[in-house]
């Protein structure tokens, strides 16, 4: 009965030794002495700050990209037990003992190492030879700039990994489509394509370029599906294609509907990436829930949702603004800096520098710091008291109000006098009665921009409001201009008569709020310094927080001042630039982002050859001359769409960008060039070399060319790893181009 247990068990494993060897070599090249140098290298000073914020769960805002990339780096810190305590203030600073350098650099290094075997698999999936696939992988292996970038706590190698994973997954899916649609492997690779695309976008916005490429290729293939006569139209198969039990039958059926194919692609390539992208932000906001240094960039409502900071100040404030309320008003737009409506005792100059006159009324500005002069009292124009009645009478949309400055008791006013820096707009002031024929015009109509259908009550933090001047219909607006010294360089406030729509510069929200209880000015000033607390809960939804955070990231502009190592896209193709990443404090050992010039120039030549050959073939095919068999032509076109197209979409957009650019921005495009190189070489050997002798000569030239690339890689190795101190003479010998900045110490 149990005799079957005595039978031998045979396990068969199909191991691709080439793939194993490439993976091993990739790991060795990227992980070897990974902790060297044990010092901050170039942009590690930038990313390290955000890792520390994650470790301490402090909110931050970075406009360079979505949070997934930072979370990947922070995961390395978490796995290494990093507590976030390190001062990231200087390139070259030695890491303290509590910083797990190996762990922090591990994930980018693994991503760089795994890109080597992925290049091999991509070329195979394009149906080119193992020799061509091995060539692409070995070029990825020895390329100096890719090695340097992947051995540091930087994100380019992770971005490249997900770019290649997206392309590889789509090719796997596309090849499954030919023989086993709707199989488990078909679903797996299609889903992984969407996941990889989302991760690429989540690492850096540059990932959108490869995502668009994959979507474009998928759209072309979907268009071809529409012309497939073996597929039915939308019919009874729709229900079947959604049932797992039918999937095995569907791959053998010729009646699978087109709708099923299109729906599957839409879910995997559109819905899944969007859901994952939202998930990245959801996890990010869970991790960084404490108040931090970037709070003021966000709205009052967002700040109030963070632990500490404004949440601590505003906790328990009254929710509904009433007549007699004491409030601070923050401009929603917050450009050029977040600021609050402010006034002080000083008046506008009688005569401005350009000769124009003013009203000489009390200045009203927008002040970028919290101050007691930011407090205003919401007064009912029909009553004299400046306190909240019992019960409180809430202010509603459309109500007339007066805004009385808390410390000077003068009312917010505007009139037909030109603003100091914006003569097309009205001056805004606090009215001083000079006993002349200039009556006060201090009535404002409240408009709640984001009011709900169920309520029109003005609410603390939540309501975004506009103040429309009753007499002139001017809207209270932050112009963004800085006043001269007489205005203490504070921001100009104007009355905008030509305002159309609800621009953020005309929208305000109450940030701090209390119910005033004293009619005496001295007691009222004491109240303003110590606001009361009443428990009110305010929680923003995730989508509200996500929308604001995403908008701020896109709208925020870093200081794009010129950098010593910044460069233009034209300099990248021919490697006319480099970046000095690190210099040993005592020796001449140094790390540079410097590419393998043989590979870079050869990649550019391969692109040119591909373009010329494709143009030649298209012209010939137009004349009904087919130089290539149909299957070879389709391989050639698909390889060009993904490899040449990948280079184009990851390179050409930089010509349109107004930002500081560096050589490392070219690395994603370079990887697609490297994939194209062996494709072009094999095509020349297979289709342009007419005889065996020509093929042999061409193969010998390719071997010589690859040997030169290996020689260059080995020669530049001291600048790639930075583990060898070279003499000034040796360093000068490595300056192959006058534009290369090799650091030579002066003794």
From Swiss-Prot:
Enzyme class: transferase
Alphabetical list of Pfam families matching this protein: MIR, PMT, PMT_4TMC
UniProt pathway annotation: Protein modification; protein glycosylation
SMART domains: MIR
Transmembrane residue ranges: 8-28, 40-60, 68-88, 99-119, 122-142, 154-174, 183-203, 206-226, 269-289, 597-617, 636-656, 661-681
Record localization: Endoplasmic reticulum membrane
Gene3D superfamilies listed in its UniProt record: 2.80.10.50
Catalytic activity, EC: 2.4.1.109
Swiss-Prot/TrEMBL catalytic activity: a di-trans,poly-cis-dolichyl beta-D-mannosyl phosphate + L-seryl-[protein] = 3-O-(alpha-D-mannosyl)-L-seryl-[protein] + a di-trans,poly-cis-dolichyl phosphate + H(+); a di-trans,poly-cis-dolichyl beta-D-mannosyl phosphate + L-threonyl-[protein] = 3-O-(alpha-D-mannosyl)-L-threonyl-[protein] + a di-trans,poly-cis-dolichyl phosphate + H(+)
InterPro entries reported in the protein's UniProt record: GlyclTrfase_39-like, Glyco_trans_39/83, MIR_dom_sf, MIR_motif, PMT_4TMC
CDD domains: beta-trefoil_MIR_POMT1 (cd23281)
Keyword Glycosyltransferase applies: yes
Entry's Gene Ontology BP terms: extracellular matrix organization; protein O-linked glycosylation; protein O-linked mannosylation
Keyword tags: Congenital muscular dystrophy, Disease variant, Dystroglycanopathy, Endoplasmic reticulum, Glycoprotein, Glycosyltransferase, Limb-girdle muscular dystrophy, Lissencephaly, Membrane, Metal-binding, Repeat, Transferase, Transmembrane, Transmembrane helix
Ranges where the MIR domain occurs: 318-381, 392-449, 453-513
CC annotations in GO: acrosomal vesicle; dolichyl-phosphate-mannose-protein mannosyltransferase complex; endoplasmic reticulum; endoplasmic reticulum membrane; membrane; sarcoplasmic reticulum
Molecular function GO labels: dolichyl-phosphate-mannose-protein mannosyltransferase activity; mannosyltransferase activity; metal ion binding
Effect recorded for residue 251 to W: Requires 2 nucleotide substitutions
Sites where a glycan is attached: 435, 471, 539
Function: Transfers mannosyl residues to the hydroxyl group of serine or threonine residues. Coexpression of both POMT1 and POMT2 is necessary for enzyme activity, expression of either POMT1 or POMT2 alone is insufficient. Essentially dedicated to O-mannosylation of alpha-DAG1 and few other proteins but not of cadherins and protocaherins.
Similarity comment: family membership: Belongs to the glycosyltransferase 39 family.
Subunit record text: Interacts with POMT2.
Protein name: Protein O-mannosyl-transferase 1
Organism: Homo sapiens
